[in-house]
């Protein structure tokens, strides 16, 4: 799947068209009010572009939370409509459902240039294709009803725009089932695709991937795929201990050890050698006597090892220096996973040093792309989003792209 040849909203003629946009308005709500409108803000450029370019109506659809195929009022998108009205400075027509004759009629009757927000897609089991029942058992949707649901959604628009990168790895009805002739990315999805194409299809070299995370076995596909693309790999986080113990018999105390992952280590090291990829591992650690913000802590080296009863919770000063050097040598940097338990201040320094190095690299002309999830949280904690080239909005979606998988929501977009 090429990421760089998909239709974008700017390739579409929108005049007089009903523009059906899949957005990601999955926002935190407290007492009926949106507590963080970041995702709503992020969709505004696409919505405004459609309005400014002659769309007859803009119809927005989204999920919120996990209502498991039932209409549950606390998961209603109604509070989002109020927030969106404030941000757009124009009325938003909120509909009580997302499909059905009443909804089709309401969309047709909405005034010219209207913004219409449909109710939560996941109030219907047909959006995800399955749900959990009261006993927590998975139940599947009736395939004929899924087809009907998709056809009903399709009837609401003339052109389809997907601006929900965070769910692009899910083959949900609103992502893959809307068979309008022209299906394009919105600005958010386009930015994601442009940056990931830059890294995965045509990187400026040297190309460095920084990987963290707890288990080798969780990241094995990611590591394998990266070894075919990068010049250098930095491995931090809990999974570094599985490598160190397996390869060099370093004492790791009570640090994370991933037995199934350890069986993959030799193959990874062999492949790196064959592909001429340098792997940079930590050589010292900040260890704690318990997994706790208030743990006693000290620095140990590979030679000393992690004492019994202690665990490695961050990388140490020598490792910070090695990681920084690797970052400053690279021209394209992909960062997925912090090197330590950044939530605890005593074990957050490795993440901050790495962040500072990536910011410095950008200032020197490198491209830095941050995969979503924990790494994006590190960046946000230090208000550094604007200082890096791109911080992905999709944790799961960006991980699957980096693993070399096809994203269903992207594959469904029309080619140029």
Swiss-Prot record:
Q: Where does ADP bind?
A: 213, 237, 342
Major subcellular site: cytoplasm
Any one GO molecular-function label of the UniProt entry: ATP binding
EC number, UniProt record:
2.7.2.3
**At which positions is ATP bound?**
214, 219, 238, 312, 343, 374-375
- Which residues bind CDP per the record? 213, 218, 237, 337, 342
| Cofactor list | Mg(2+)
Its annotated pathway reads: Carbohydrate degradation; glycolysis; pyruvate from D-glyceraldehyde 3-phosphate: step 2/5
Task: Enumerate the Gene Ontology biological process terms.
Answer: gluconeogenesis; glycolytic process
Known catalysed reaction(s)? (2R)-3-phosphoglycerate + ATP = (2R)-3-phospho-glyceroyl phosphate + ADP
Where is it localised?
Answer: Cytoplasm; Mitochondrion
Name the record gives this protein: Phosphoglycerate kinase
* Organism annotation: Agaricus bisporus (White button mushroom)
